[in-house]
């Protein structure tokens, strides 16, 4: 009997449920860019929490320093380039009403975003 890590089992289930090549090339590229941006998005998420906490605790100097770090992440040319490409791909994948044209694209992208969210913790 083969024993898999729970996350591997979930990934295998998604692979089994989704035929190979079922998502569009735009969705594949979107997912690849999400993977590249995952560390930056995780850092931004943590900084947002730290900024909110610093503001609530009235640690103005800390909040200002954290906002500067956040702004520095946004100024990175590679990050900016990738995020602009994501916006273009999102427009192509979207049906104009907030949903994906292809439900399998939405499912694959959503899965990637959930996995990234939980890896960030």
Model-found features: residue ranges?
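Bacterial N-terminal signal peptides that target proteins for export
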Residues: 1-9
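Disulfide-bonded cysteine motifs in exported proteins
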Residues: 3, 37, 114-115
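Extracellular/secretory pathway and lumenal proteins
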Residues: 11-12, 46
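N-terminal signal peptide c-region/cleavage motif recognized by signal peptidases
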Residues: 17-19
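Immediate post-signal-peptide N-terminus of mature secreted/exported proteins
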Residues: 21-64, 118-120
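Compact alpha-helical subdomains of small soluble proteins
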Residues: 67-121
């Amino acid at each position: 009997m083969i024993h898999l890590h729970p996350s591997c089992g979930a990934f295998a289930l998604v692979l089994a449920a989704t035929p190979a090549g079922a998502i569009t090339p735009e969705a594949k590229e979107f997912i690849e860019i999400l993977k590249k941006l995952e560390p930056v998005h995780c850092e931004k998420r943590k900084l947002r929490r730290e900024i909110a906490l610093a503001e609530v605790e009235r640690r103005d100097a800390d909040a200002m320093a954290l906002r500067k770090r956040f702004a520095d992440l946004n100024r990175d040319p590679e990050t900016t380039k990738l995020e602009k490409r994501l916006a273009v791909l999102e427009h192509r994948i979207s049906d104009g009403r907030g949903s994906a044209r292809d439900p399998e694209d939405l499912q694959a992208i959503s899965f990637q975003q959930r996995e990234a969210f939980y890896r960030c913790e």
